[in-house]
UniProtKB/Swiss-Prot annotation:
Domain (LRRCT) ranges: 132-179
Underlying gene: Lrriq3
Keywords of the record: Coiled coil, Leucine-rich repeat, Repeat
Record field: compositional bias (Basic residues): 325-336
Protein's recorded name: Leucine-rich repeat and IQ domain-containing protein 3
Coiled coil: 556-617
InterPro entries: Leu-rich_rpt, Leu-rich_rpt_4, LRR-IQ_domain_protein, LRR_dom_sf
Pfam families reported for this sequence: LRR_4 (PF12799)
LRR repeat coordinates: 51-72, 73-94, 98-119
Organism (species): Mus musculus (Mouse)
Region of interest called Disordered, as start-end residue ranges on this chain: 324-343
Domain spans labelled IQ: 215-244
């Protein structure tokens, strides 16, 4: 394994060229790199890792991090425990737009001016610079916090509002370096972590920082309160209006609803009309379905036409591809239950629109309808279908074969001797008379249609007036019930307050009794404790005296034993001295005897030698023999 940078000879070798190309292609897809404690000196090989998101180069010998400029997608960068002394310029850090966590602790940074380039990181949340020389300088934290705006946590503490807002004194909980703001921004590295684990760890750290700020930042707490107030204020009309829409039901014809509103109230009505799609119906009137309505919507009869410009009901008479058309609005789930409730109402709020074929109208009727539209009558219903633009031809009556045969025979026999002018005049007269009768009949039909139309409009108006009257009546009843309910609520609340007061009075009385009992118990406990203290002191004194007596007796016994031992030692010494003297005398006697014996032996030897010299050394022969004398002489 190669430590540090790979040499140029190895990378530029011909046999390694294809291998290097493959490595470069693979490095483009790297998202996670971890080289911790490998004694690396450079990171030039990371220039091609354009997809890198998590980079861990801790505990190495790096001095330059410029090769990371191409890694634009970095989220976490761990460079702690290296030998970095200077950081790249602001352009380098502005390119890392996704960088959220940066670990630079335990490096050689010494100048605050060099660290201020980190202000180019637009999304940096966590930064560590402890155990660096620059962290010992005065104002180090103030400079970093106010130069890197998105920063939320520095070293071991989350940034407080007191560090950002000048001259703002906060309670102990929100102060700088308070225990509530402490957070371990750099957890210990775990061996064998994957990219997913690192991403989870990053998310956990960021969420934990945000949670600490949300609970310990006065600015964020006030902002949360204001946002909640604004949202509640914005939604309060909806919740207030929603309370009145409870239970009154009417039946309407199951058709498509077309509502063109001119104000916000029209949108509100559209939201509260629920229509259920009907099954396949061809040429028949659809079933009746239920629908919620509010009495407030029919409050004013004159303004009803202004709020809703068009409520047209189109019967479903076409069946396309065997499927019915779906309405825009969703189905209300409780419609069947509402139908059963609406049938039991005291007031009948139903009305029906009869389905009939459209009669034939002349051009006069069309003009009359146009005139009515120009006059803009209030009772002219907009949901009726318009008159047909073209006049339909009357049906032609065909003669039978027998009549045609008779006519041909008559013309063949009587044509030559008979003139037909009179018959032509008669036929013309009858045809004109028939035409006049047809026109009169059509005019009568048109008049009857107009009369029925007016009657229908009058009936509709009466129905609407009845509905408005009934809705007003229902509103009055609802108001009465609401007032009664409010009065009942106030009564219950007053009764509840009285009960609470009684409970409070009872509680205070019990509290006083408990306080008296507690004071009595405390006094008894104090007296008992004093008595116990006296008893314990007396017992302690007795015990102390008994211990003293026992110690005195022990001392006397030990002194007597020691004296007895000393006497024994003296006697033993005397006996030993006597024995030693006896032994010494015996030894002296033995030594003297031995010395005397040896002296005697020496004397005997000397005498023998003298005698020998006298006897043998007188003559010369003896002198010659003296040379061969034994050694023991």
């Amino acid at each position: 394994m190669f430590h540090g940078t790979i040499t140029k000879e190895l990378t530029s070798h011909e046999e390694w060229s294809h291998y290097n190309e493959n490595i470069i292609e693979d490095q483009k897809d790297f998202v996670f790199v971890k080289y911790s404690g490998l004694h690396l000196k450079s990171m030039e090989n990371l220039q091609t890792c354009i997809s890198l998101r998590v980079c861990i180069f801790s505990n190495n010998f790096l001095t330059d991090i410029q090769p990371l400029q191409s890694c634009k997608k970095l989220i976490k960068l761990d460079l702690h425990g290296n030998q970095i002394k200077t950081l790249p310029d602001k352009n380098f850090w502005s390119g890392l737009k996704n960088l959220k966590l940066l670990y630079l602790h335990d490096n050689g940074f010494s100048k605050l001016k060099n660290i201020c380039v980190l202000s180019g990181c637009v999304s940096l949340i966590g930064l560590t610079m402890f155990d660096c020389p620059v962290s010992l300088k005065k104002g180090y934290r103030h400079v970093l916090v106010n130069s890197i705006w998105p920063l939320k946590a520095l070293d071991h503490h989350v940034i407080s509002d007191e560090e950002i807002i000048q001259n703002w004194r906060l309670p102990e909980r929100f102060k700088t370096f308070s225990p509530s703001l402490f957070f371990n921004l750099y957890p210990a590295l775990i061996k064998g972590t994957t990219y997913e684990d690192e991403i989870k760890n990053i998310k956990h750290i960021i969420s934990r920082i945000n949670e600490i700020l949300a609970h310990n930042s006065p600015v964020l707490i006030i902002q949360r309160w204001i946002r909640g107030f604004i949202v509640r204020k914005h939604l309060s009309p909806y919740f207030k209006h929603k309370k009145h829409y409870h239970g009154k039901m009417i039946r309407v014809l199951e058709t498509k609803l077309i509502c063109i509103g001119r104000s916000d109230e029209d949108k509100y009505l559209e939201d509260f009309f629920f229509i259920k799609p009907e099954c396949n119906i061809k040429g028949k009137v659809a079933h009746w379905k239920q629908m919620r309505y509010s009495p407030a919507d029919f409050k004013y009869s004159t303004e009803y036409g202004k709020h809703i410009s068009c409520l047209s009901y189109e019967l479903k008479t076409k069946y396309i591809d065997g499927k019915s058309k779906q309405p825009r609005h969703h189905i209300h789930k409780g419609q069947k239950a509402m139908k059963a409730e609406s049938e039991d109402e005291e007031v009948d709020t139903e009305f029906r629109i009869s389905a009939m074929k459209i009669p034939l109208y002349s051009s006069r009727s069309l003009k009359y309808g146009a005139m009515l539209k120009e006059m803009k009558w209030d009772y002219f219903p907009q949901y009726l279908q318009p008159f047909p633009a073209t006049r339909q031809k009357p049906p032609v009556k065909r003669e039978t074969l027998w009549k045609l045969k008779k006519r041909r025979e008559f013309l063949a026999t009587q044509r030559a001797g008979m003139k037909l002018h009179m018959f032509d005049d008669v036929d013309k007269y009858y045809s004109e008379q028939k035409q006049h009768e047809e026109e009169a009949r059509k005019f009568a039909a048109m008049v009857t249609a107009q009369v029925t139309q007016e009657r229908a409009s009058v009936n509709i108006r009466e129905k609407l007036n009845k509905k408005i009257y009934m809705t007003r009546k229902l509103m009055e009843k609802d108001n009465e019930t609401i007032q009664k309910g409010l009065q009942q609520i106030w009564r219950e609340r007053l009764a509840y307050l009285e009960k609470v007061r009684e409970r409070k009075f009872m509680f205070l009385a019990e509290k006083k009794l408990n306080a008296a009992d507690q004071s009595l118990v405390i006094s008894l406990n104090n007296e008992r404790s004093i008595l116990l203290k006296g008893i314990t002191q007396v017992e302690r004194l007795k015990k102390h005296m008994s211990e003293k007596k026992a110690k005195h007796l022990d001392v006397i016994e030990k002194w007597e034993e020691q004296k007895y031992k000393q006497d024994l030692l003296m006697e033993m010494k005397k006996l030993r001295v006597e024995e030693i003297q006896k032994r010494h005398c015996e030894e002296k006697f033995v030594i003297d005897t031995l010395i005397l014996q040896k002296g005697y032996e020496r004397l005997e030897e000397a005498k023998a030698k003298v005698e020998y010299i006298k006897t043998f050394y007188t003559s010369k022969s003896h002198k010659r023999r003296n040379e061969a004398m034994p050694d023991h002489i």
